[in-house]
C-alpha cells in the first residue's frame, strides 16, 4: 500500500443532520468518455462527444491525444446545448512525451494507439503509476510487432516507457494474461480495427475482473462500425476478435458515471432519505448499475422512472455477502456502508484491487480500523464486522474512491476529516460542493 501522503489539508466530512432529499446530477462517465476519445481519434472522420466528463483523467487523455496530433475542440454541441468536444482525427506523430498521471485508461489504452504513430511516443506519469502493471499490454504489443523500450528508465513491464511507432502495426492473434486488469483486453480491442490484420485477443490467465468494462468496450466499438466477435456472441471462451476496418465518426452522448453516483445513493441508504439520479440509463454496461441491486440488498429501495433512478433508504443498513469481481471499483463505497451496517459483511472477488490507484484492500482496512472499525483482509477481499466508530483522519492515498468512502462514513460519524479530498477531481470534479448541496449545507 502506498504510504500515507503528507498532505496537510483536511476536509471535515459533513455529518448528516437528518434524512437527505435531493436530486444529484452526476457528471459523465470517465470510462465511457475515455473510450469514446480513443475511438474518435482513430476514426476516419470527425465526431462529437456530448456531455463528456471534465476531470483529471479525461483531460489527461485529451491532452495526450492532442500531443500525438489529434484535434480536440471544446465547445457546445451541434444543437447549441450542453458541453461537447469535437474530435478531428489526424496523422499521429512523434516524438512527444505523454503524461498519463495515474490514469489506468490513459496508461493502458494509448500505447496501442502509439504504435500507429510516426515516431516515438514516451509515456510517463505520477510516481504511483510506476507501480501499476502494464506488462499485459507491453508484451502483447511486442508479440504483434511493436518496438517498446520499458527497461531504460524503470522496471520492465511498467512506466516510464517509449513506444516507437512505425505508422502501422501488423496485428493478428495474441495471448495475454489480463487477470490483473481487464483494461489489457480493452486496450488492444480499441485500436484493433486500425491494425493491418485486426486483432484476436486470447486471455490465458485466471478469472477476468471487471467484465462489464470489456462489454462496454465491445459495445462502443460496434457503435462506431467495428466488427467484433466475443464469447457472448457465440465465439470461443476468453477470445475477442476485431476485424480490420475504418471507424466511423459519431455523435455520442456520454452517460452519467453510475459508479460516481455511489456516495450519493449511499447517503440515502445511511440517512433513510431519498436521492434521485437523473438520466440513469435503462440499459448499460457500466459496473455502477450493480448498485441498484447491491444497495437494495443492504436495505434500500430503488425505482427507475422517467425522472431517473429514485433510491430510498429504509433507515436500516444490512450487511451483505457479495462477489464484486465484476464491479470491483464499487468496493470502497460498499465497505464504507458495510462498516455502518447492523450485521457483518464479506466482500469477495476483488484481489485485483491491490493493484489499483493504491492497494485499496489494505487502505480500507487500515482507515476504517483507525476509526474504531473491525475489518480484516482476506485473500480476495474484506470481512467487515460493524463496530461503533469514532472521528479521526481518513487518509485517501491520492485515491478518489477512498475519499468518497471517507465522506460516506462521515455522514454518520462525527469529526471524520478527509485528507486530500481534492483527489476526487480524478473523476468527480466539485465533489465537496455536490456533497454539501445534497445535504443542504454550505461547503465545509
Protein language model features and the residues they cover:
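Structural preference for solvent-exposed beta-strand-turn elements
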Residues: 1-444
Amino acid at each position: 500500500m502506498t504510504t500515507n501522503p503528507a498532505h496537510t489539508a483536511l476536509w471535515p466530512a459533513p455529518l448528516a443532520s437528518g434524512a437527505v432529499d435531493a436530486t444529484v446530477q452526476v457528471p459523465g462517465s470517465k470510462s465511457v468518455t475515455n473510450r469514446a476519445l480513443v475511438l474518435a481519434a482513430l476514426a476516419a472522420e470527425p465526431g462529437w462527444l456530448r456531455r463528456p466528463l471534465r476531470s483529471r483523467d479525461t483531460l489527461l487523455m485529451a491532452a495526450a491525444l492532442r500531443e500525438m496530433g489529434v484535434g480536440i475542440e471544446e465547445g457546445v454541441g451541434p444543437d447549441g446545448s450542453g458541453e461537447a468536444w469535437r474530435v478531428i482525427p489526424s496523422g499521429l506523430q512523434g516524438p512527444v512525451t505523454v503524461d498519463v498521471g495515474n490514469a489506468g485508461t490513459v496508461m493502458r489504452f494509448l500505447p496501442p494507439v502509439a504504435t500507429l504513430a510516426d515516431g516515438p511516443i514516451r509515456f510517463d506519469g505520477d510516481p504511483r503509476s510506476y507501480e501499476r502493471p502494464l506488462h499485459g499490454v507491453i508484451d502483447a504489443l511486442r508479440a504483434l510487432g511493436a518496438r517498446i523500450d520499458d527497461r531504460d528508465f524503470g522496471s520492465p513491464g511498467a512506466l516510464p516507457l517509449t513506444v516507437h511507432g512505425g505508422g502501422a502495426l501488423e496485428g493478428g492473434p495474441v495471448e495475454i494474461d489480463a487477470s490483473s486488469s481487464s483494461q489489457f483486453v480493452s486496450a488492444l480491442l480499441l485500436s484493433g480495427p486500425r491494425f493491418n490484420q485486426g486483432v484476436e485477443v486470447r486471455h490465458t490467465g485466471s478469472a477476468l475482473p471487471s467484465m462489464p468494462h470489456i462489454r462496454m468496450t465491445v459495445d462502443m466499438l460496434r457503435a462506431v462500425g467495428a466488427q467484433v466477435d466475443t464469447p457472448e456472441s457465440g465465439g470461443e471462451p476468453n477470445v475477442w476478435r476485431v476485424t480490420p476496418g475504418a471507424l466511423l465518426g459519431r455523435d455520442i452522448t456520454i452517460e452519467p458515471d453510475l459508479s460516481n453516483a455511489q456516495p450519493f445513493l449511499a447517503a440515502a441508504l445511511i440517512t433513510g432519505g431519498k436521492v434521485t439520479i437523473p438520466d440513469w440509463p435503462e440499459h448499460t454496461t457500466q459496473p455502477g448499475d450493480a448498485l441498484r441491486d447491491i444497495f437494495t440488498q443492504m436495505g434500500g429501495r430503488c425505482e427507475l422512472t422517467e425522472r431517473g433512478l429514485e433510491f430510498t433508504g429504509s433507515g436500516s443498513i444490512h450487511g451483505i455477502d457479495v462477489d464484486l469481481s465484476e464491479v470491483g471499483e464499487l468496493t470502497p463505497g460498499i465497505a464504507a456502508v458495510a462498516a455502518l451496517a447492523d450485521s457483518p459483511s464479506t466482500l469477495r472477488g476483488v484481489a485485483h484491487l491491490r493493484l489499483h490507484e493504491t492497494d485499496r484492500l489494505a487502505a480500507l482496512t487500515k482507515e476504517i480500523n483507525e476509526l474504531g472499525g473491525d475489518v480484516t483482509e482476506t485473500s480476495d477481499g474484506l470481512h467487515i464486522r460493524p463496530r461503533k466508530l469514532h472521528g479521526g483522519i481518513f487518509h485517501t492515498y491520492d485515491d478518489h474512491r477512498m475519499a468518497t468512502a471517507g465522506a460516506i462514513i462521515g455522514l454518520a460519524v462525527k469529526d471524520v476529516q478527509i485528507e486530500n479530498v481534492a483527489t476526487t477531481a480524478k473523476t468527480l470534479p466539485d465533489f465537496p460542493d455536490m456533497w454539501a448541496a445534497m445535504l443542504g449545507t454550505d461547503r465545509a
